[in-house]
Structures are given as C-alpha cells and as structure tokens.
C-alpha cells in the first residue's frame, strides 16, 4: 500500500515525509478495520480508500488559508484527518453528531498520536465558535446554501468556507444568499479518480 500511495502522491505533485505516509496508511487500515462494525464508509477496499478518501482530501491542503479549521459533518474524519496529517502546524476540530463516528476519531487520535485534532460530538448549529475559525470545511455535507446558513457563526471576520464538491455546483452557487460571495472555484486533480472534483471557496461580504 505504501508503494501505491507514493505513486499517487507523485502523480498529484504532493511531497510528504515517510512518517506522514505511514500515518495515512495507518488511518486507512483503521478505517478498514472499524468499518466492518461501524459502517463508516461505503468504500470497502483499502486501495480504493487511498484514492477516494486520502488523495481526495489532501489535494485541498494548498488552498487552505489560516491555522485553525473546523471540519463539519466529518463522518470518519474526512477530510479532516488526512488534512491534519499533511498540515501538522494547523489545528482541526472534527465535528459530527454521531457518537460512533466520534469514538472512532478519538481512537485514531490516540493510535496515530495526532495532537492537532479535536473530535467533538455536536450538531453544527449548536457548536460554539470561540475563538472563531479561519476556515470551515465540508465534504459531502450539505448544499452551499445550507452550509453557510448552518455554519454562519463559525468563521472569523477573515474566515472562509471550503466546500468540497463533485461536479461544478453552478445551481448551488446561484442560490447563495447575497451576503456571501464565491471567492474562487478550483478544479481539483485527483489521480486515479473517476469523476470531477471542485473546491468552492466562499467568504462573507463585508458590510
């Protein structure tokens, strides 16, 4: 699996240390093991997880601005855990409402010795944001409109929303409230992945 990951990273132009690669593989192995009992993901093959979960998450890392992020609706830690491994200087709050997912995240935190994550069980609407976050990240969480509505209290004045999407979400962008603007849309290149991937970066308009 290490060889496959190394080839995928090379194709993506991403350079990681051996320690980071081993952490990513350990996370995939844990996800595969726990998935049998906890049903954390529909992806069953660890090699497929490398593409659809690991690479699909970490290609976002160069576009994140700031040091303090929250991954809302993180599920089994996607994209938050892979991002925390490749961005060890940043801190990631991993938010999910289901206890079994948060238990898995805490076990990952313990086994991989990840000091820059904080798994939290909470609904996003009820989670306090003190201090506010530099970035609110979501992957397969909600429409853009729902994301900014439910998470409006989380980013700071200069904070951004980072929404990981499949195809270009033109309809969702058109429905964004006028107090928000799309700062950029990045077409992501994920090696060995069928289908499109886009990152939509949103900021609140200054009043």
From Swiss-Prot:
This is Ribosomal RNA small subunit methyltransferase G. Disruption phenotype: Low-level streptomycin resistance. It is found in: Cytoplasm. Keywords: Cytoplasm, Methyltransferase, rRNA processing, S-adenosyl-L-methionine, Transferase. Changing residue 75 to A: Lack of activity. Low-level streptomycin resistance. 24-fold decrease in AdoMet affinity. It catalyses: guanosine(527) in 16S rRNA + S-adenosyl-L-methionine = N(7)-methylguanosine(527) in 16S rRNA + S-adenosyl-L-homocysteine. One of its GO terms (biological process) is rRNA base methylation. S-adenosyl-L-methionine binds at residues 73, 78, 124-125, 139. Changing residue 197 to A: Strong decrease in activity. Low-level streptomycin resistance. It comes from Escherichia coli (strain K12). Disulfide bonds: none annotated. The keyword Oxidoreductase does not apply. Its EC number is 2.1.1.170. Coiled coil: none annotated. Induction: Induced under stress conditions known to stimulate ppGpp accumulation and down-regulate rRNA synthesis. It is an enzyme of class 2 (transferase). Belongs to the methyltransferase superfamily. RNA methyltransferase RsmG family. Its main location: cytoplasm. Specifically methylates the N7 position of guanine in position 527 of 16S rRNA. Requires the intact 30S subunit for methylation. Changing residue 73 to A: Slight decrease in activity. Streptomycin-sensitive. Slight decrease in AdoMet affinity. Changing residue 96 to A: Lack of activity. Low-level streptomycin resistance. Changing residue 71 to A: Lack of activity. Low-level streptomycin resistance. 10-fold increase in AdoMet affinity.
